[in-house]
Amino acid sequence: MAVIIRSTGTHIPERRMPNSELATLVDTTEEWIDSHTGIGARHLAADGVLTSDMAVDAAKKALAKAGVEPRELDLIVVATATPDYFGFPATACIVQDKLGAYGSAAFDLGAGCTGFIYALDVASSMLEARKARHALVIGAEALSRIVDWQDRSTCVLFGDGAGAAVISRIEEAGRGLIASVLGAEGSGAMDLFLIQEERNATFERAAPLVPKISMNGKKVYDFAVKTITVLVKR
């Protein structure tokens, strides 16, 4: 028995912001962005387009390639830091409804940049444990809406879009996902976070504030390089 990635699909917003345009907004240059990040451009969702909209578009493409009908899905997992709604309902439930995948399990997963990897691991494990057939794994973000466009250390890095994968449990041996390694380092949580209202209690009433991304770029970079090297060797 194995779990395979049967197909993938993407949603790339039409609006494209090249480095040359970004260099007119903040104190940076096209060459600096390219040399430090390797990014040439980022795509931005149009006004009114939600995370679930991008997720659904990517999902439809993946399902069509796989030849799997939405009603055949047993599970939908959406990894996102920018859900349609804070708290609930889950964006995965909205995606389920828009696809017509009635009856499937559906939930969101939040793990930042590693969200899709976590979602793929969780979904494949659930397919094996529950002896289910098909799952839809989606990573979707509308990060441009929480980026501080005056902060060059973060606005150069993030954009919008979605990717989806249909994964399936098969009886054939010698194929499929081989292994995965997951981990976290909670001590660095505040090196990359959303600036929000300070609250004494989780749901204490407070004045609304649009959250913005804050990042200690050097620490995040050092951690990523060190950790990826260790994980690859494992």
Model-predicted segments: where are they?
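Short beta-strand segments
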Residues: 6, 79, 110, 135-141, ...
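Acidic, glycine-rich active-site loops and adjacent beta-strand->loop/helix elements
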Residues: 10-11, 79-84, 111-116, 139-144, ...
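Conserved catalytic cysteine-centered active-site region
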Residues: 32-53, 81-135
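Generic recognition of short, well-ordered alpha-helical segments
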Residues: 57, 89-90, 149
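Structural signature of cysteine-dependent C-C bond-forming condensing enzymes
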Residues: 65-74, 99-105, 127-141, 172
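Flexible, glycine-rich active-site loops centered on histidine and acidic residues
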Residues: 126-162
